[in-house]
A protein has these predicted regions:
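Hydrophobic h-region of N-terminal signal peptides that target proteins for export
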Residues: 2-18
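Conserved RNA-binding domains used in RNP assembly and mRNA/RNA metabolism
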Residues: 14-122
Length: 122
């Protein structure tokens, strides 16, 4: 009986010290959509801002390409027709995965402007 109580106590103590799972934020970024080999990236992109997974409403679509400094690799893109938006400014929403090369698991992609910001990396 004492052994069982001790074991239960030790398991509870261990579980309470387990690291919390990382929260992955849903963000919105705007930038120039480029194809690099088999990867799609957003270059000259804005800083990520908290958002929802839904498509950006018209009020949040910029009228001109923003001058951002970030690059994001886009993943989970099979549902979106990215070749149609290549070399254009797009608003991307999705799950933000911060890393050496930050990624966004795309939940929404909307064309904003039919061109990219001047000086956007090719």
């Amino acid at each position: 009986m004492i052994c069982r109580v001790f074991t239960t106590f030790m398991i509870a103590a261990f579980l309470s010290q387990a690291p919390a799972t990382k929260k992955i934020d849903i963000v919105s970024v705007t930038g120039c959509l480029r194809e690099h080999g088999s990867n799609w990236v957003l270059v000259a992109a804005t800083d990520p801002t908290p958002s929802s997974a839904n498509q950006a409403p018209a009020a949040e679509i910029p009228p001109a390409p923003p001058a951002g400094k970030n690059t994001f690799r886009l993943i989970g893109i099979s549902e979106f027709n990215l070749p149609q938006m290549k070399d254009r400014t797009v608003v991307i929403r999705g799950l933000f995965i911060k890393d050496k090369v930050s990624r966004i698991n795309v939940t929404s992609a909307v064309e904003a402007v039919a061109s990219c910001a001047p000086g956007a990396p090719k």
